[in-house]
Regions:
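Generic structural motif
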Residues: 25, 39-41, 61-63, 120-124
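Small/polar-rich, solvent-exposed N-terminal microdomains that initiate assembly or binding
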Residues: 1-46, 81-91
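Short, ordered beta-strand-loop transition motifs
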Residues: 28, 46-48, 104-109
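Extracellular/virion structural assembly segments
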Residues: 51, 59-83
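Oligomerization/assembly interface segments of phage tail-like spikes and tubes
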Residues: 48-62, 111-121
Length: 124
C-alpha cells in the first residue's frame, strides 16, 4: 500500500469524523479511537495493480453499539461497491467495505471492533 493511498484513506476517515491514526494512537486517550494497519496481497500481475486489506481497529470504554455505529458509518461511506479516486501522482485507488467483527478482550471495561476494507491501487 502506498503512502499516497494511506493518505487518501486518512482523508476519508477525517471526512467521516472518525478519530484515527496509523499504526498507533499517539494523542491523549479519549474514546472511541481507531488505529489502522494493512496487509498486502502478493501481486502476480504486471499491470501495476496492488491489492490489500486495510484493518481499522476501534477501541472504546462505551458499548459495542457505539463501535457498531462507527462501523455502519464506514460501511455506508465506502459501500460494497467502493469509492474510487485518481491520486495526485495519477495512480488510481478503489476502497470498499469488506467485513467486520467484535474483538473479545480480557479487559472488562474495554471493547474493540475490527473493520476490514478492501483496497486496490493501480500505479502509473
Amino acid at each position: 500500500m502506498t503512502i499516497e493511498g494511506l493518505g487518501f484513506i486518512t482523508k476519508c476517515f477525517a471526512e467521516m469524523g472518525i478519530p484515527y491514526e496509523f499504526m498507533e494512537w499517539t494523542q491523549g486517550v479519549s474514546f472511541p479511537f481507531f488505529v489502522g494497519e494493512y496487509s498486502e496481497i502478493e501481486s502476480l500481475n504486471e499491470d501495476g495493480l496492488e491489492e490489500g486489506t486495510f484493518i481499522l481497529t476501534g477501541t472504546t470504554t462505551g458499548t459495542y453499539l457505539e463501535l457498531e455505529t462507527v462501523k455502519e458509518t464506514v460501511k455506508n461511506y465506502f459501500g460494497y461497491e467502493g469509492i474510487t479516486a485518481i491520486l495526485e501522482s495519477g495512480s488510481g485507488i478503489a476502497v470498499s467495505y469488506g467485513t467486520s467483527y467484535p474483538i473479545p478482550i480480557d479487559e472488562q471495561e474495554v471493547r474493540r471492533i475490527q473493520i476490514n476494507l478492501n483496497v486496490k491501487e493501480w500505479r502509473c
